[in-house]
């Protein structure tokens, strides 16, 4: 029996193991399951959305039909439909869907932040008066100085008389209108 040389595997044609472009990425079974579960949760979030919100998310016809069907069915059938939606999402690029869903979620947070800023501005208007009015006019040049001063004067009177803050609410509504008309 003849002994093979030690480098006999180096001469095998088509041996591209050292080629870095064809690198195989090993993914564990657990990671695949986690990704599938995450996509199923994304599908469940899509099913929980209303029709108007779904219109704002880029979905193809098959996926949209599956989501609408899942919204109509109940219990065990719904669970199976959610699994189907998860499977459909695995075959698609979900980044645009996630981005659109994040925009929908963040819109509420942005409104809350805006309302807090407007409440703070309203409180400053009532406390500081004309200095804060000048700042409002810098922010929104189309604001009506006379209307703001009148509302501030009424809000101060209501506060001193321990009356309901009707004018303070009107100031907030006016500031909200200014902010909405700007954007």
UniProtKB/Swiss-Prot annotation:
Compartmental location: Cytoplasm
Keyword RNA-binding: yes
GO molecular function: ribosome binding; rRNA binding
Function: Member of a network of 50S ribosomal subunit biogenesis factors which assembles along the 30S-50S interface, preventing incorrect 23S rRNA structures from forming. Promotes peptidyl transferase center (PTC) maturation.
Annotated Gene Ontology cellular component terms: cytosol
Organism: Salmonella arizonae (strain ATCC BAA-731 / CDC346-86 / RSK2980)
Protein name as catalogued: Dual-action ribosomal maturation protein DarP
Keyword Secreted: no
Stored HAMAP family: DarP
InterPro entries, A to Z: DarP, DarP_sf
Protein origin, superkingdom: Bacteria
UniProt main location, coarse: cytoplasm
Family: Belongs to the DarP family.
């Amino acid at each position: 029996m003849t002994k093979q040389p030690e480098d006999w595997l180096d001469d095998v044609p088509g041996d591209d193991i050292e080629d870095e472009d064809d690198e195989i990425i090993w993914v564990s079974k657990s990671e695949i399951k986690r990704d599938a579960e995450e996509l199923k949760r994304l599908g469940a979030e899509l099913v929980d959305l209303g029709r108007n919100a779904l219109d704002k998310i880029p979905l193809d016809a098959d996926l949209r039909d599956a989501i609408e069907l899942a919204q109509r069915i109940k219990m065990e059938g719904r669970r199976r439909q959610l699994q189907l939606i998860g499977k459909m999402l695995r075959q698609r690029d979900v980044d645009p869907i996630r981005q659109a869903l994040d925009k929908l979620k963040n819109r509420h947070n942005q409104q809350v932040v805006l309302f807090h800023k407007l409440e703070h501005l309203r409180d400053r208007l009532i406390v500081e008066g004309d200095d804060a009015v000048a700042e409002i006019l810098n922010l929104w040049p189309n604001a009506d100085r006379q209307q703001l001063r009148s509302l501030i004067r009424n809000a101060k009177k209501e506060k001193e008389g321990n009356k309901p803050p009707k004018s303070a609410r009107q100031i907030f509504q006016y500031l909200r209108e200014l902010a909405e008309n700007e954007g």
